């Protein structure tokens, strides 16, 4: 006996726990693997649940290989879809009377179990058996019927026990009526509920006595569909049921809407304030007072209208307000009445009741999902289109406000030129670069100043450039032009010449004062300074004094052969050429002419004048200030090639390497290396052959080179001598 003994372990609240678990998973969006979308909104669900409750979804999801498909349903109202999903997960749903017809049509299309004609036909035999038991039992206690009921297992997740026991509660104390024929499968469950609401007053006491028996019936036979609610609801103690059956005996192909006469009114009528204030006590026309669909009765059989009194009028009294639609939460919330905990079966747990509660204490409602806020806010009427998230006025990315720049003041911009003119100064960098702070202004030149000084013993020289053609002498005429003027009132051109003279070690002031505008063939150097008219006289006097000082300084430099360096009056360290290694006067004139051009360029760049160097064979225009004023006044232009250089040192180096390049390549006479320029050769010797004595050149070779190109040969010798003296 011990070997054959087995124990049966039963989970009493298994069905309610399973359904509650699925509800909680969907509310938390856990393990959801399918999305239903319509009208631009979506609902997430589980494939297993949809497939178990709808053959349509079962076939569709079988043929879909996607892990998380999105099913777009055309011509389906979102509220109907939301109600269907809630029905699938909960087994019941509260639907407004005006939405009932479209809801049933959507359920028919999606073939939801419990809401279709096929489901009613499958359960017709069970309903007939229940009716026979009810007719033969008379006033027999209902728990006997519960024990004899079959238990089909066709997998329907909805719980229609409340619907099945709806009419038995109300007619328990009534006299037994005549025999009722078998109900056709197309009986509308909503019609039966509505008619039962009309007789709820007489059935309240009897339903209270048998409430526990009905709960047991509901727990043992959860799989009965909604359309089969007539079975347990056909308690023949109700005197008005035969007319109902005769009234609905004619077959109907589509679910009918059994609302009152005013159900054809506008469906978009907003809900009344009184109906909002009443809360989720019932949706009026359908008579579903709580989430279990038990008509106007809660779990213990007490009518909601009896409990609430005048707060919730009966459906007959509210016939004039049938066109008014309740809030969406009135249709979906179930447990906001006073005895919400009593509406579940005895097998239900407290956790299950808390999860199904939709009160304001934070518990999850039976229809709680990610779209509840959209349903409550965007659906004032059932068929209204979803509202815009933002109004057109709020949908602008930027406001029509002007952008202000407080740091830019037009008056300050207008006065910038004058301020810079007053605050500029002339500075000489340690590398010999002349830097100025100048602005561009337009000045009308009316006069040209020609400085003539014939007291220089070096007034004649021979200088030509291979890149310039022979032109006649030119004297600049008074024109209106744009030049760069210094911001200081002191003349700067003699200072620039003095600076250049200190850098080169030569007296360049002789070329600035040599010649006249009609110089002729004597090779005089004509310089015309274009200055403002108010400074011309002061410039002329200062230039004369500077020229005399430079002549005396040159004589002192030539007489002092022992000193390698001396300090100039302008504060620039100048390198003087040793007397012993000084070449002929012709070579010095050639080199001085080049440096005079560089000095004139620096002087004109600093904004003091527009200088022109003219002789019989070439014209050297060094008016760098005119053409370079737009670049900031820091460029030094080489006129033969029109190249701008940033400093005077670079301009000098450029003239030496490019325009004074000898015909023979610069070759180191010690290591015989060939370089691209004299500057590179000089750097090479200063690094590698600094301590070596320079070898003497052959006289014949030097004479040949001098005869071929005396200027370049002498310049090359000058570079070598300068390097030797510095080393």
Curated annotation (Swiss-Prot):
GO terms for biological process: autophagy; cellular response to ecdysone; compound eye photoreceptor fate commitment; dendrite morphogenesis; eclosion; follicle cell of egg chamber development; gravitaxis; male genitalia morphogenesis. CDD domains: BTB_POZ_BAB-like (cd18315). This is Broad-complex core protein isoforms 1/2/3/4/5. It comes from Drosophila melanogaster (Fruit fly). GO terms for cellular component: nucleus. Keywords: Developmental protein, DNA-binding, Metal-binding, Nucleus, Repeat, Zinc, Zinc-finger. Coiled coil: none annotated. Residues 227-238, 445-460, 475-495, 533-568, 713-727 have a biased composition (Low complexity). Residues 32-97 form the BTB domain. Residues 135-149 have a biased composition (Polar residues). The lineage of its organism: Eukaryota, Metazoa, Ecdysozoa, Arthropoda, Hexapoda. Pfam families: BTB, zf-C2H2_6. Residues 341-355 have a biased composition (Basic and acidic residues). Gene3D superfamilies: Classic Zinc Finger (3.30.160.60), Potassium Channel Kv1.1, Chain A (3.30.710.10). Residues 281-298 have a biased composition (Gly residues). Induction: Primary response to 20-hydroxyecdysone in third instar larval imaginal disks. GO terms for molecular function: DNA binding; RNA polymerase II transcription regulatory region sequence-specific DNA binding; zinc ion binding. The keyword Cell membrane does not apply.
């Amino acid at each position: 006996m011990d070997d054959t003994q087995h124990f049966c372990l039963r989970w009493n609240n298994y069905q309610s726990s399973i359904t509650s678990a699925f509800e909680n998973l969907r509310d938390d969006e856990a393990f959801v693997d399918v999305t239903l979308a319509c009208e631009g909104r979506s609902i997430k669900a589980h494939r297993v649940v949809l497939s178990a409750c709808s053959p349509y979804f079962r076939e569709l999801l079988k043929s879909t290989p996607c892990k998380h498909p999105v099913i777009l349903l055309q011509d389906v109202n979102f509220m109907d879809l939301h109600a269907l999903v809630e029905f699938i997960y909960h087994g019941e749903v509260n639907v407004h009377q005006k939405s009932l017809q479209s809801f049933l049509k959507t359920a028919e299309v999606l073939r939801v179990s419990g809401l279709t004609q096929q489901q009613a036909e499958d359960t017709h035999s069970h309903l007939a058996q229940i009716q026979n038991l009810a007719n033969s039992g008379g006033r027999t206690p209902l728990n006997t019927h519960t024990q004899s009921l079959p238990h089909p297992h066709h997998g329907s997740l909805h719980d229609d026990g409340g619907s099945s026991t709806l009419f038995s509660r109300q007619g328990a104390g009534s006299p037994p009526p005549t025999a009722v024929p078998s109900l056709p499968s197309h009986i509308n469950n909503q019609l039966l509920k509505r008619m039962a609401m009309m007789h709820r007053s007489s059935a309240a006491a009897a339903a209270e006595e048998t409430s526990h028996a009905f709960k047991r019936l509901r727990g043992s036979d959860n799989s009965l569909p909604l359309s089969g609610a007539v079975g347990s609801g056909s308690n023949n103690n109700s005197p008005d049921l035969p007319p109902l059956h005769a009234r609905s005996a004619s077959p109907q192909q589509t679910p009918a809407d059994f609302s009152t006469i005013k159900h054809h009114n506008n469906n978009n009528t907003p809900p009344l304030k009184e109906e909002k204030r009443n809360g989720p006590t019932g949706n009026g026309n359908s008579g579903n007072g709580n989430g279990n669909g038990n008509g106007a009765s809660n779990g213990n059989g007490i009518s909601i209208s009896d409990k609430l009194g005048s707060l919730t009028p009966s459906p007959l009294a509210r016939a004039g307000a049938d066109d008014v639609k309740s809030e969406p939460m009135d249709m979906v919330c179930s447990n906001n009445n006073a005895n919400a905990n009593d509406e579940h079966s005895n097998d239900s747990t407290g956790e299950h009741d808390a999860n199904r509660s939709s009160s304001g204490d934070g518990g999850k409602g039976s229809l709680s999902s990610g779209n509840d806020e959209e349903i409550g806010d965007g659906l004032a009427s059932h068929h209204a289109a979803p509202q815009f998230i933002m109004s057109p006025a709020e949908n602008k990315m930027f406001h029509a406000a002007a952008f202000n720049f407080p740091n830019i003041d037009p008056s300050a911009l207008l006065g910038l030129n004058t301020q810079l003119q007053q605050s500029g100064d002339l500075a000489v960098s340690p590398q010999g670069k002349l830097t100025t702070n100048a602005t561009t202004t337009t000045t009308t030149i009316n006069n040209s100043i020609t400085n003539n000084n014939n007291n220089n013993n070096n007034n004649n020289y021979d200088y030509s450039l291979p890149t310039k053609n022979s032109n006649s002498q030119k004297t600049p005429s008074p024109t209106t032009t744009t030049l760069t003027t210094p911001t200081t009132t002191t003349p700067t051109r003699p200072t620039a010449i003095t600076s250049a003279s200190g850098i080169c070690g030569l007296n360049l002031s002789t070329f600035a004062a040599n010649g006249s505008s009609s110089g002729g063939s004597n090779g005089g150097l004509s310089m015309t300074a274009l200055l403002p008219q108010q400074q011309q006289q002061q410039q002329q006097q200062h230039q004369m004094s500077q020229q005399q000082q430079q002549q005396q300084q040159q004589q002192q430099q030539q007489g002092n052969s022992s000193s390698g360096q001396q300090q100039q009056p302008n504060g620039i360290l100048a390198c003087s050429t040793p007397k012993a290694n000084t070449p002929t006067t012709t070579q010095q004139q050639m080199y001085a002419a080049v440096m005079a051009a560089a000095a004139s360029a620096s002087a004109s760049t600093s904004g003091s004048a527009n200088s022109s160097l003219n002789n019989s064979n070439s014209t050297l225009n060094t008016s760098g200030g005119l053409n370079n004023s737009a670049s900031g006044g820091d460029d030094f232009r080489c006129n033969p090639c029109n190249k701008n250089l940033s400093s005077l040192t670079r301009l000098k180096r450029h003239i030496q390497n490019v325009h004074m390049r000898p015909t023979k390549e610069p070759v180191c006479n010690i290591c015989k290396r060939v370089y691209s320029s004299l500057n590179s050769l000089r750097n090479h010797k200063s690094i590698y052959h600094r301590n070596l004595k320079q070898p003497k050149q052959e006289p014949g070779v030097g004479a040949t080179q001098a005869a071929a190109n005396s200027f370049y040969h002498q310049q090359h010798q000058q570079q070598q001598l300068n390097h030797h003296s510095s080393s």
